């Protein structure tokens, strides 16, 4: 009989790299429960093996929810942990070794991502810190000096420096102890050093760094009482976090802040809520003043709703903001404030009229031949459906780059859609517990169709009322088939135009398939009333 504790962290888990953590305890009985022995002896090393998954090292088996014996080998056991599945091949060993079995299926909540031009991709996620990726296709160890949940990243664009904040709970202590931490990296997240938190004014929260890395800004999750108490919830440190002083000039205690990636003296803050004010600092964050508004005073047609500012890393004061950011997913519909752009540090704003609703915006590497970063956004462009869009002309035109089968529930907790500054066309989006999804511009495949070598077009289908729109077909030889779930053909026809009118007698779940010879070019599932 084998049993474990559940969220009672008295066990010690040691890894081959010398790291360790507290977790659940295993108990084994081989006499029907008359006697028991503990399988987690303190000091034994190693007791767990990352098994090629660099990010899991330093964690533990915890929240144990299920145990399963191999029905053909009682020495082999699986356990379901809060971070995945572990297995031991010899439960009877003096110190059983548990190997991590989950490859590529860990579900995480991403909060922030930064693509460093000429450098790595740096992430902040809940529960497992995040990492600095040279190659996003390779399993990578989490940030050194682990926190657990990295609440925020501050980025110094001119020097590649980072700040990372959070709260650490030491479950090995009796009772468990929780404390605030703030880590600094001077090498784009490859290594991290702890800063002095003795004077930290509150629980580590949202961060920003000046472009040269010399000034830190912090909006704590909550402020401490006593010697560090203040009515301000924005603080500034000019000595690497040793001392903090409240910033002045703000009429808000909450909001999103960023540094100017080109001018180290400038910071920007948009308060949370719907007031639409934009604040800026030109003295490295010591004082702020209102410089502009996101409300169109003539028509009152748009305002900020907790929008996250994005800055062009190659031009000072060049800012973008999504004006519908409070709604990462809303089944009943969205506001239609859209997207706004400023080139003077937030003093004046121009609404991008091609964008109907913009819930998140980000920038990435410029397209070949372009001198301006590519824009990515989650929202609705013109009369197109909700999705991920790309623009290579500062938002004048947009191309949807996902389809209805790849929405992932929208940007969710992290609220971000951002491009990669090293790979044109690569885009990242946060999700609700599904990790960071990314997309690339793929090569158009060459396919053999009916004995002919042809370039298969990258086609998309989308439903607009009872019209099925066909995008980027590039041939007149395709055939459209509409089927029910059993595969019965409901409607079929040769495609002669970019839109097909659906028969009025079609109702319920319909599967559309566009075919060229024996090759399926695109498919779409939808429900008709």
Language-model regions, residue ranges each:
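Short, conserved, GDST-rich strand-edge loop motifs in beta-rich repeat architectures
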Residues: 5-24, 140, 168-177, 221-229, ...
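Residue-level signature of beta-propeller blades and closely related beta-rich strand-turn architectures
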Residues: 7-8, 83, 91, 127, ...
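Conserved Ser/Thr-centered positions that define the repeating blades of beta-propeller domains
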Residues: 29-30, 71, 87-89, 127-134, ...
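Surface-exposed loop and turn segments in beta-propeller and other repeat-based domains
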Residues: 38-58, 294-300, 404-409
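Conserved blade-ending motifs and adjacent loop-strand segments that build the rim/top face
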Residues: 46-52, 101-111, 147-151, 353-362, ...
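Signature of short aromatic-glycine-proline-rich micro-motifs recurring in repeat-based ectodomains
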Residues: 52-68, 110, 148-152, 204, ...
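Blade-level signature of beta-propeller repeat domains, shared across WD40, Kelch, NHL, RCC1
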Residues: 409-445
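C-terminal outer-membrane/trafficking sorting elements
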Residues: 450-529
């Amino acid at each position: 009989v084998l049993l474990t504790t559940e969220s009672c962290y008295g066990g010690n888990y040691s890894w081959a790299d010398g790291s360790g953590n507290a977790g659940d305890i295993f108990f084994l009985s081989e006499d029907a429960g008359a006697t028991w022995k503990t399988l987690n002896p303190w000091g034994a090393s190693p007791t767990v093996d990352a098994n090629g998954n660099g990010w899991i090292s330093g964690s533990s088996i915890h929240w144990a929810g299920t145990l399963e014996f191999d029905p053909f080998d009682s020495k082999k056991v699986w356990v379901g942990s809060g971070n995945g599945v572990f297995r031991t091949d010899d439960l009877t060993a003096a110190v059983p070794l548990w190997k991590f079995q989950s490859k590529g299926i860990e579900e995480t909540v991403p909060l922030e991502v930064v693509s460093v031009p000429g450098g790595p991709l740096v992430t902040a996620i809940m529960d497992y810190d995040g990492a600095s990726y040279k190659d996003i296709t390779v399993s990578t160890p989490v940030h050194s000096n682990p926190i657990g949940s990295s609440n925020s990243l501050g980025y110094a664009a001119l020097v590649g420096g980072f700040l990372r904040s959070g709260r650490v709970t030491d479950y090995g202590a009796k009772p468990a102890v929780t404390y605030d931490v703030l880590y600094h990296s001077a090498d784009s997240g490859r290594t991290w050093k702890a800063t002095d938190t003795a004077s930290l004014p509150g629980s580590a929260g949202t961060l920003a760094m000046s472009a040269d890395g010399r000034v830190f800004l912090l909006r704590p999750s909550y402020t401490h009482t006593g010697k560090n108490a203040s009515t301000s919830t924005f603080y500034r440190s000019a000595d690497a976090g040793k001392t903090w002083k409240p910033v002045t000039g703000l009429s808000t205690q909450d909001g999103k802040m960023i540094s100017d990636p080109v001018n180290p003296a400038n910071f920007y803050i948009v308060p949370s809520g719907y007031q639409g004010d934009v604040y800026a600092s030109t003295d490295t964050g010591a004082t702020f003043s209102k410089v502009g508004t996101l409300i169109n005073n003539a028509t009152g047609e748009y305002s900020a709703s907790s929008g996250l500012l994005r800055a062009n890393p190659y031009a000072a004061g060049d800012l973008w903001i999504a004006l519908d950011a409070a709604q990462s997913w809303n089944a009943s519909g969205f506001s239609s404030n859209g997207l706004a752009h400023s080139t003077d540090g937030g003093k004046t704003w121009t609404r991008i009229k091609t964008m109907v609703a913009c819930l998140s915006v980000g920038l990435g590497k410029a397209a070949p031949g372009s001198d301006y970063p590519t824009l990515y956004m989650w929202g609705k462009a013109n009369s197109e459906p909700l999705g991920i869009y790309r623009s290579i002309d500062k938002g004048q035109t947009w191309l949807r780059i996902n389809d209805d089968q790849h929405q992932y529930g929208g940007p969710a907790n992290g609220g971000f859609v951002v491009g990669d500054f090293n790979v044109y066309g690569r885009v990242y989006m946060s999700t609700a517990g599904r990790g960071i999804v990314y997309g690339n511009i793929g090569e158009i495949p060459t396919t053999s169709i009916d004995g002919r070598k042809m370039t298969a077009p990258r086609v998309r289908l989308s439903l607009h009322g009872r019209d099925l729109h066909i995008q980027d077909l590039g041939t007149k030889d395709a055939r459209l088939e509409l089927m029910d779930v059993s595969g019965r053909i409901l409607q079929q026809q040769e495609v002669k135009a970019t839109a097909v009118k659906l028969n009025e007698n079609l109702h319920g779940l319909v599967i559309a398939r566009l075919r060229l010879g024996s090759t399926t070019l695109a498919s779409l599932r939808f429900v008709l009333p």
